[in-house]
Amino acid sequence: MSNKAWGGRFQSEPEAWVDAFNASINFDHLLIDEDIQGSIAHATMLAQQGILTEDESNTIIKGLQEIQQDYHDGKIEFTEALEDIHLNIEHELIERIGAVGGKLHTGRSRNDQVATDLHLYTKKAVKEIIHLIHTLQETIVKLADDHVDTIMPGYTHLQRAQPISFAHHVMTYFWMLERDKNRFEDALKRIDINPLGAAALSGTTHPIDRAKTQELLDFAALYENSLDAVSDRDFVVETLNDISLVMIHLSRFSEEIIFWSSDEAKFITLSDSFSTGSSIMPQKKNPDMAELIRGKTGRTTGHLMSMLMTLKGLPLAYNKDMQEDKEGLFDAVHTVTGSLRIFEGMLASLTVNTDRLNETVHQDFSNATELADYLVEKDVPFREAHAIVGQIVYWCIQHDCYLLDVPLEKYQEFSSSIDDTIYSYLKPENCLKRRKSYGSTGQESVRHQIKVAKDLL
């Protein structure tokens, strides 16, 4: 007979390399706290239901707590031969307290056990992610608050388009992150459900109380169907999806940080603490943290795709394929939490080069739309105004100047509707002041936007 926990019907042991292929302890050891938390709740409930005696339950719980402490103190090493965190803990428990440790698994399967662990882990991880998003949002709002009057070129197609407020630009990412935060908060409704007691797939004949373990583990609800309880990994997919979106938003912001900090732009200066150098080029200051966040976005999206493909053809209920749910989730959580911390520190410590931004916005044609609007206010049809401004811009390019440099006589050759008020009208700071529509880049609108954001925080 095999010595495995499931070895009664087997006449030989697997080869060591088969054990290694089958094992998940190399990564699911991260679930030790959740596994012991779930087991303590299960043991407590078994005693309450008279399935275990109080002494048996107390002995089991004390043993579990000692294993947990010894593991974190580095006194225990788990083994691949015992496959996973569940059987490693059970084996260690029986070694310590004897046969009574084997009673812990009464009315429970590894199927509902691992599902419980994963729900607990994901719930904790999502709450941490929400907190980190909130912290980053606070930093964005502070940065925006300091730069409502800082003007920069806004871009479309990476071409300068219209003058905007620096605050308005960075606040865009506040709202992206707000949607991310809302998605995670909504996902908690589907994460915060107790699968414990579903056993392998069909429930158990033992008189367990699933509501009690729900209470002890602080879950908001119970699975209504035991098959669904052990088969469901929607909450993992949803969490990976939400992580992927956060990372995509951080990646987009990182791309802008990289461009803004370049010698070509010089819009911002990154702190030395969040930059690195070159091993051969002494002058280099590289935005490696932003580049790494941009690069790591691919791996989180990859984990999402991997999980979807793992699930797409699985019959009910549990299948060993589902062991593949953990590494991607663990890595995605580690990646997004690290990225949020790094990005917040990078953003909090950067310097906005306001003079450079102001200089840049005075040396482009981003006020061309203003000239068209000016003509429209003079009762010139917009399409005609658009064509006139296009001709003026072409003339400026040919003569190496900008709209504020064009002599009035030349303006009036293009349109008699233009008078000397055009020069004040085209100043970038006045372009912003005239933007008064809700949600626009005008200072009044941006200050209102920041107030709304502060109220949300």
From Swiss-Prot:
Belongs to the lyase 1 family. Argininosuccinate lyase subfamily. GO terms for molecular function: argininosuccinate lyase activity. GO terms for biological process: arginine biosynthetic process via ornithine; L-arginine biosynthetic process. It is found in: Cytoplasm. The keyword Amino-acid biosynthesis applies. It comes from Staphylococcus carnosus (strain TM300). Disulfide bonds: none annotated. GO terms for cellular component: cytosol. InterPro entries: Arg_succ_lyase_C, Argininosuccinate_lyase, Fumarase/histidase_N, Fumarate_lyase_CS, Fumarate_lyase_fam, Fumarate_lyase_N, L-Aspartase-like. Its EC number is 4.3.2.1. The keyword Transcription does not apply. Keywords: Amino-acid biosynthesis, Arginine biosynthesis, Cytoplasm, Lyase. This is Argininosuccinate lyase. PROSITE patterns: FUMARATE_LYASES. Pathway: Amino-acid biosynthesis; L-arginine biosynthesis; L-arginine from L-ornithine and carbamoyl phosphate: step 3/3. Signal peptide: none annotated. It catalyses: 2-(N(omega)-L-arginino)succinate = fumarate + L-arginine. The lineage of its organism: Bacteria, Bacillati, Bacillota, Bacilli, Bacillales. Pfam families: ASL_C2 (PF14698), Lyase_1 (PF00206). PANTHER family: ARGININOSUCCINATE LYASE.
